[in-house]
Amino acid sequence: MDELQIIEYDGIRVLTSQQIADAYEADANLLNKNFNRNKDRYVEGKHYICLQGDELRGFRAKGQIDVSPNVNKLYLWTEKGALLHAKSLNTDKAWEVYDKLVENYFRVRSAVNSNL
């Protein structure tokens, strides 16, 4: 969890589904199932960003992370989206890691910006 690669999109820190699954020690397919089962609770732009087409090509071109050429849709999760995943998994590990994500991943950028 301490070695998460930092990913930013439009100036906000985000995580990929795989990063969340790895950090929460969960199966990425389970995260996907939970998301699809509760999709009406997730708000695009607030909980996640879905990149496709030109947006995905532009994101790939920036080279922040390797995105397979076979991927035609990439979900990036915000702090609030990571919270919903922790809630749906409801494991001790997910809650523990979520707290660390807030303190050490999502909040770091806002702390740096407020000191400028």
List PLM regions with ranges.
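An anion-engaging/catalytic patch
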Residues: 1-116
